[in-house]
Amino acid sequence: MRWQLSKPEIIPTSTQTMQEVVEKNLLVTRLEDLVAWGRSNSLWPFNFGLSCCYVEMATSFTSRHDIARFGSEVIRATPREADLIVISGTVFLKMAPVIKHLYDQMLEPKWVICMGSCANSGGMYDVYSVVQGADRFLPIDLYVPGCPPRPEALMYGLTLLQEAIKDGAPRQARPLNRTITPEEIQAFACRNMRDEKHEQRIKADKLTPPDEV
């Protein structure tokens, strides 16, 4: 079998003009769109959790759900290297200033996902010691309802956030007023990259030997 890394039709030949070669190898776009596309596909979550919902958040990092498919596999242990924080669990009054301090240390631009009923609105804890919604002291980009939400719900919320970043949603227009509904969670099917790229891999039957590249 012959090995080839590029399709024959896209390999420059002596008969092609410079314009034809450039058109096949260059992508023209706006710098803002390119940066937004890069940011949306390389979100770095901060490894931070508060309560029960963090268990579901951590489950999304496992191989079964594989959040790395959406470019968020680089889990950061420090807020100074993260640009996404998921408020997952009950926000107690004692933790509110700690969360705000962690948020202030994150890189700009930064995004916040509010995960679970307790983080969204206090949940069942309508008491003096629990903040009735993290949006009382943080700007929230996306709300994921549930008690607790499933990992699929968090990943679906992540895809919605990615689309908002790609579309260039202004940071000043927060919150985005976007709440995931149970119907959307149920209808959301986890993307299977293996099946999506199956036909593409099957067609790649001509590869160039490494010593001839």
Curated annotation (Swiss-Prot):
Protein localization: Cell inner membrane
Coiled-coil ranges (or none): none
Assembly and interaction partners: NDH-1 is composed of 13 different subunits. Subunits NuoB, CD, E, F, and G constitute the peripheral sector of the complex.
Name used for this protein in its record: NADH-quinone oxidoreductase subunit B
Membrane topology recorded in Swiss-Prot or TrEMBL: Peripheral membrane protein
Organism: Shewanella woodyi (strain ATCC 51908 / MS32)
Cofactor binding notes: Binds 1 [4Fe-4S] cluster.
Any one biological process term the GO annotation gives: electron transport coupled proton transport
Record field: catalytic activity: a quinone + NADH + 5 H(+)(in) = a quinol + NAD(+) + 4 H(+)(out)
EC number(s) reported in the record: 7.1.1.-
SUPFAM superfamilies, sorted: HydA/Nqo6-like
Key words of the record: 4Fe-4S, Cell inner membrane, Cell membrane, Iron, Iron-sulfur, Membrane, Metal-binding, NAD, Quinone, Translocase, Transport, Ubiquinone
Highest classification ranks of the organism: Bacteria, Pseudomonadati, Pseudomonadota, Gammaproteobacteria, Alteromonadales
Pfam families associated with the record: Oxidored_q6 (PF01058)
Residues annotated as binding [4Fe-4S] cluster: 52-53, 118, 147
Keyword Iron-sulfur set for record: yes
Cellular component annotations (GO), alphabetically ordered: plasma membrane; respiratory chain complex I
Gene from which this protein is expressed: nuoB
Function comment: NDH-1 shuttles electrons from NADH, via FMN and iron-sulfur (Fe-S) centers, to quinones in the respiratory chain. The immediate electron acceptor for the enzyme in this species is believed to be ubiquinone. Couples the redox reaction to proton translocation (for every two electrons transferred, four hydrogen ions are translocated across the cytoplasmic membrane), and thus conserves the redox energy in a proton gradient.
